[in-house]
């Protein structure tokens, strides 16, 4: 998050503002008590992660499809907000947060040398 994004969450907490535009993957949502309104008009796009692979790569490495399919639907907005919070507010390295999460999900095994 940018400093201005963190400031807007602080302004909400301090009751200086009543409404703000957010991303549902904002790290600050993990620790905030703001109420996120439903986007019933679908004005804002989804920021959910997905995998995209060229067909020629899958033809060359067919085993890749099964590996990548394991990543489907493991990240929802709340999880992304939690992971983003670890990077944005706790100062963890993105690669460390990703590694820990994938290990928790049983998708990555780290072997010691």
Residues covered by each model-derived region:
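Short secondary-structure boundary segments
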Residues: 23-25, 55
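Ligand-binding "clamshell"
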Residues: 12-17, 28-41
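Short helix-initiation/N-cap motifs at beta->coil->alpha
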Residues: 1-10
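A bilobed periplasmic-binding-protein/Venus flytrap-type ligand-binding module shared by bacterial periplasmic
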Residues: 48-61
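Ligand-binding clefts/hinges and TM-proximal coupling segments of bilobed small-molecule sensing domains
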Residues: 63-110
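Paired acidic/hydrophobic, glycine-rich loop segments that form the ligand-binding mouth/hinge
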Residues: 17-23
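Short Pro/Gly-enriched coil loops immediately N-terminal to beta-strands
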Residues: 39-49
């Amino acid at each position: 998050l940018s400093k201005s994004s963190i400031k807007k969450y602080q302004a909400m907490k301090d009751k200086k503002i009543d409404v703000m535009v957010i991303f549902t993957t904002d790290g600050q949502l993990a620790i905030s008590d703001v109420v996120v309104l439903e986007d019933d008009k679908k004005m804002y796009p989804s920021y959910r992660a997905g995998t995209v692979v060229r067909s020629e790569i899958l033809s060359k490495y067919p085993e890749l499809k099964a590996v990548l399919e394991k990543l489907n639907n493991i990240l929802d907005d709340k999880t992304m907000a939690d992971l983003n919070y670890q990077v944005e507010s706790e100062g963890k390295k993105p690669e460390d947060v990703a590694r820990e999460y994938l290990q928790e999900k049983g998708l990555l095994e780290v072997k010691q040398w």
